[in-house]
Amino acid sequence: MSNKIDFGVSTWLWQSPFTSKSIELFPKIKKLGYDLVEIPVEDPLLIDAREIKKALSDNGLKVSVCGAFGPTKDLTHEDPKVHRQCFDYLEQCFELCNILEVDFLAGPMYSAVGKARMVSPEQRKVEWDLAVNNLQEVCIMAAGHELSIALEPLNRFESDMVNTAEDVMRLVTDINHPSARVLLDGFHMTIEERNIREAINTVGDKLIHVQVSENHRGVPGTGLTPWTDFKLGLDDIKYSGGLVIESFTPEIKELAAAVCIWKTMAKSQDEFAQQGLKFLKQTFND
């Protein structure tokens, strides 16, 4: 690719939650050959952003930040108090992003992960409007920090609201704020999209972040993902930015249960990271 890709990996591959002690992973991530580390923020109070920033600098790593949106961080909840909790959490995340000098916060922040139900069209509209109105407020908050938000479609088993590139673009259009942008995750795309290349083109220049693993959450290159189409799509839109491996360790039981990881996907998590990066560089570097 002629445009610059930063190859990254999420610390979820090894640990959960991310804390200040997780900086012990950074030398290994750099040694493996990564440009970027992705920090998932489950609890902002566990993270000393200035300590993290120094460790990133010491190891020559760039950083991206994603949020974690469980039942207590649901902008479509019927109780406005839950919205307030989510706003407070997002404010903490935005402050962390500013200290780390990143440009956006990523994640499926329109609703709670795992909220997947059959509801009436009337209820769906109520929840959609809640998401739009609350995300307009989130965008105003983000803009106050000179940040964007990267909204992520999830597969149908994890969300009943935003599953495809077309869905997320409708959401971005309805929000109608320049801070509303998009993250695409190849794992979810292999479940929901009819054509990966077309989906990427649907998002176009709204795409500011990309996550990948495989259709089975395993090492990139070992599954059914149409990687040629993936690369062509990113080439079409002249994408430059992060290409981050996001998978999980079955050793952290709570996290494994949340994402349905019941078995190891490689001999070790380090091998997962090593093999995955090798494949991505072979595929996405010209």
Predicted segment positions?
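Histidine-acidic metal/acid-base catalytic patches
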Residues: M1-T11, Q15, T19-K30, D103, ...
